[in-house]
């Protein structure tokens, strides 16, 4: 609708106040949110991928979490687990970082297949089962998984069947010379002055 279009324009305006360039990437992120999909992003570190998603989360007053995928990561580190409380003698459920609106899975191909599968299951089911209890992730829910196309040593490539779980694959390139000049000019902590464009319920 026209109102929805105006709201998205407000979101774009606010994010672009902070993130210079990467318009193609930002637009794909918004498409994924509205279509309830997820993104697989390829690009070297330092291209504002984290900043873009974090800024977008702040713009809609959503929650944002980042997980650095490593070879020693466990599925429980993502989804959560049951913890024993010595003081009370009871078990309680501790939910993992997937319970957020915007999740950045940084270098997903650095974690073993069982961890990748745990994340992909949450992406598809939008819920987690811990000790027989189901817990739904919040809405909106967007997973942006990144891969570094240059450093592949010691990685666990995603099988094609798992790559298909993502709505789209986005290649993030370097900014232009003009954009780099603007970036240098604007390194003044502008993120502190952001305005809310809409909230989770409106989205």
Tell what function each PLM region has.
Residues 85-89, 107-115, 123-198, 203:
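Canonical AAA+ ATPase core
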Residues 43, 106-107, 118:
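Walker B catalytic acidic pair
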